[in-house]
Amino acid sequence: MNKFRTFPQINTLIEDESLKSYPFYIKAFFCKKVVAKLKENFSQDEISKDKLLLEIKKEIKTFYRKDLQSVINASGVVIHTNLGRSVIHEELYEACKDIICNYSNVEFDLENGKRGSRYALVLEKLKMLFECEDALVVNNNAAAVFLVLNSLCYNKEIISSRGELVEIGGSFRVPEVIKAAGVKLCEVGTSNKTHLKDYEQAISENTALILKTHKSNFALMGFHSEVNIKDLHELAKEKGLLSYYDLGSGWCENLNEKLIKNEPKIKKLVQECDILSFSGDKLFGSVQAGIILGKKELIEKLKQNQLLRMLRVDKLTLSFLNESLKAYLQKDYEKIITLKLLNDDLSFIEKKALRVQKELKFQTQLKKSKSLVGGGSMPDKSLDTYILTFQGDALKLQTRFRKENIIGRIENDEFVLDFRTIRENELQKLILIINQMENL
C-alpha cells in the first residue's frame, strides 16, 4: 500500500485558486519542493491540502524576498562588501543608461567600421589619470592577480613576504591564487618582519618576479617591519626581475586627510614598480573591476593570454567605470559616493541624525561613535560619526529593522543606526519605514 496516498496530487495544488496569481513555473517548483520535503519527514498523520498550501505560499513569499533588493546601510561601514561595496551615483547611472539599454560600440570602431577594442573606452582615461604607460581591466582584483602571475611567471618562481600572504573575503588566499596560476611561491622573512636581504638571498635562476601585497584588510602593530615597493623594484631591476604590487585597495584623489597616512596612493606607486593592480569598487569608489596598470610591454603580454577572454568585463562594467574615470578627471568628486561618505564632516552627519530623530515617533538617543572604512581597506582607522540608539532588546531590534531592509549594528548592547553611511536622499524613506513599525 502506498504510504503517501493521503498526499494531495501535485496538479491539484498547482491549480488551486489561492495560487492563481503566481507564475506556473514558480508555483510548480515549490509545490514539488514542499511535498518532497514532507515525504522525507513522513508521519502517519493525515496531510491536509490547506496545510500544504500554507507552506507553499510561505516558500513562495520567501523566494520573492530573496531577490536582490536595495537596503539602507546604517551599519557605519562605508565600503560594505556584503552590501555591494561602493554605490554608483544616480547621475553616473543616468549617463550609462543609454549604453546599457541599447546596442553600443563596445567592440566596434565607429570611424573605420571594423572591430575595435573593448578596453579603448577606458584605457586613455586610465593612462591620463594615473600617468601610466598602459592599462587593462578584468572583472575583479583576484582575477587581476591571477592573470598577471599566469602571464608573466608561469612555471617560474615568485618571492613574497610571509607577512603579506593574506586571506581575503570568502577564504580566498594569496598562496592558493599563486598556485592556481601555475607559479611556485618562495616565502621569505617572518610573519612580523621581512628585510630586503631576505628577498635578495632567496633569488634563484628560476625567480621571475618579486610580489608585494598590500595589507589592506589587517594591520600589524608593534614590533614589525616590511620593505617598500620602491626598494623591491630597485632590487628586481638590478637582478633582471619584475616587481608587482597587488594593491587591493589604494586611493586615487581627494581622500579624507585623516585616512591617507600609510595608505598608498596609486599614482605614486605606479612609478615605483613594473606593474600593479587594485579593486575598482573599494577606495576608488566605482564598479567591481580589477584595474591593472604598468609597463606597456607587460600589459601586452597580459592581453595575449587566452585567459583574458574568460576574465574580460562587459559593457555594464566598462560604462560605469568610464563615467567614474570622467568624474575623477573633471574633479567632480561629489559623484564618487564612497569618497563623499568618507569625507563628510561631523556636523553634516549630526544634522542628518537630528533630522531623523526629530521626526521619529519613537524615543532615541543621539551619541557620538566611530564608523569604519570597510571593504578590506584601512582596518586600523576609524571615522567620527553620530548614531541614534533605540531602547529595547538589541538583537530583536536588529532583526526587526533588517526585515525592513535597514541594516544597523549592535554597539554596547544597543541597536544603533550610524548616519555616516545613511545618504541624505534616504532620510525621508528611513523616517517613513520606522514610523510605520509597531511596538518598537
Curated annotation (Swiss-Prot):
NCBIfam families: selA. Pfam families: SelA. The gene is selA. Its cofactor is pyridoxal 5'-phosphate. The lineage of its organism: Bacteria, Pseudomonadati, Campylobacterota, Epsilonproteobacteria, Campylobacterales. GO terms for cellular component: cytoplasm. Its EC number is 2.9.1.1. Its main location: cytoplasm. The modification N6-(pyridoxal phosphate)lysine is found at residue 282. GO terms for biological process: conversion of seryl-tRNAsec to selenocys-tRNAsec; selenocysteine incorporation. It is an enzyme of class 2 (transferase). This is L-seryl-tRNA(Sec) selenium transferase. Converts seryl-tRNA(Sec) to selenocysteinyl-tRNA(Sec) required for selenoprotein biosynthesis. InterPro entries: PyrdxlP-dep_Trfase (IPR015424), PyrdxlP-dep_Trfase_major (IPR015421), SelA-like (IPR018319), SelA_trans (IPR004534). It comes from the Bacteria. It is found in: Cytoplasm.
